[in-house]
Each structure stands twice: as structure tokens, then as C-alpha cells.
Amino acid sequence: MVNLNQSLGDLFKGIIPNVYVLGATIVSFLILFLFITYFVYRPLKKYIKKRKDFLQSHIDLTIKSNVEAEKLEKKSQQKLLETKEFCTDLKEKSQIEANKFLEDAKKTAIDNARQLINEGQKVLLEYENEIKSKYYMNVINVAVEICQKYLEKQDKNNKILQQSLIADLEKELKKRENSSKKKDNFGK
């Protein structure tokens, strides 16, 4: 049993450390812990916090920008719809105005054409009447000249016959003038 006690004592002797070594280990651990805490952990924690804040601010800014972009897109879509409606209304109004203008222009052109036709017909009637009166005057003048020549020839032969022919001729001229006046009045 002695052996057993001694071997157990040797076994436990190696397990229980020396107090000085244990104290030095604890002190070195504390120094290392403090060193790591102040020089590694805290700066790393600050850097991670700054980085996290930086990323979070960018995420928030991105979300805010997306919301603003959606609002602007909605506004743009609304303005686009309003512009399309305005263009459609403007197109319809311009077509109505153009059709109205065309109708007015057609009406004016038709009225002007009718007026020109009426004036042209009046001018033609006046010209026709003028030509007729000139024609009748030429016929009368030619007839008078023929009669005068005939009468001059007959004057030598028979003065009485000449006077009766002149009287008849004057009557005939008056009838023709009256009939031409009647025709002129009838033609008008």
C-alpha cells in the first residue's frame, strides 16, 4: 500500500502546480488579456462599429434613395400620363379646329366661286348685249348705206319713189330698234 500511496502522491504532485508559477501565469494572462483588450479588441470593436455604421448609413441612404426614386418614378409616370392626355386633347382640339377651318374655307371658296360665276354671267350677258347692239347697229348702218346707194341710183329715176322708200326705210329702222330694244329688254 505504500507503493500505492506513493504513486498516488507522485501523480497528484504533478497535477497541483507551483503557487509562484500559477501566480505568474495568472498575471501574464491578465497582462495579455488587458493588452489584447486595449490594443486589439477595442480598436477592432471601434473599427467594426464604424464600419457597421458606415454600411448601415449607406444601406439607409440606399433605401431612402430607392424610396425617393420610386416617388420620382411615380411622379414621372403621372407627368407622362398627364402629358399624353394633354397631347391627346391638343391633337383632338387641333383636328376639330382644322376641320372647322377646312369647312369654313370650303364654304368661303364655294361662296366666292358662286359670286365669281354670277359676276361672270353678268359680264357675259352685258358683253353679249353689247355685241348684239353693235351687231344690230352694224346691220342697220349697212342697211342704211345700201339703202342710200340704192336711193341715190333711184333718185335719178324717180324722186317720188325715193321719198316713199326713205319713209318706209325709216319706219323699218324704228321697228328694228324697237324690236332690238324689246329683245334687249327680253334678254335681260
UniProtKB/Swiss-Prot annotation:
It is found in: Cell membrane. Pfam families: ATP-synt_B (PF00430). The chain crosses the membrane at residues 19-39. CDD domains: ATP-synt_Fo_b (cd06503). GO terms for molecular function: proton-transporting ATP synthase activity, rotational mechanism; proton-transporting ATPase activity, rotational mechanism. GO terms for cellular component: plasma membrane; proton-transporting ATP synthase complex. Its main location: membrane. It is a single-pass membrane protein. Keywords: ATP synthesis, Cell membrane, CF(0), Hydrogen ion transport, Ion transport, Membrane, Transmembrane, Transmembrane helix, Transport. F(1)F(0) ATP synthase produces ATP from ADP in the presence of a proton or sodium gradient. F-type ATPases consist of two structural domains, F(1) containing the extramembraneous catalytic core and F(0) containing the membrane proton channel, linked together by a central stalk and a peripheral stalk. During catalysis, ATP synthesis in the catalytic domain of F(1) is coupled via a rotary mechanism of the central stalk subunits to proton translocation. Component of the F(0) channel, it forms part of the peripheral stalk, linking F(1) to F(0). F-type ATPases have 2 components, F(1) - the catalytic core - and F(0) - the membrane proton channel. F(1) has five subunits: alpha(3), beta(3), gamma(1), delta(1), epsilon(1). F(0) has three main subunits: a(1), b(2) and c(10-14). The alpha and beta chains form an alternating ring which encloses part of the gamma chain. F(1) is attached to F(0) by a central stalk formed by the gamma and epsilon chains, while a peripheral stalk is formed by the delta and b chains. Belongs to the ATPase B chain family. PANTHER family: ATP SYNTHASE SUBUNIT B', CHLOROPLASTIC. HAMAP family: ATP_synth_b_bprime (MF_01398). This is ATP synthase subunit b. It comes from Mesomycoplasma hyopneumoniae (strain 232) (Mycoplasma hyopneumoniae).
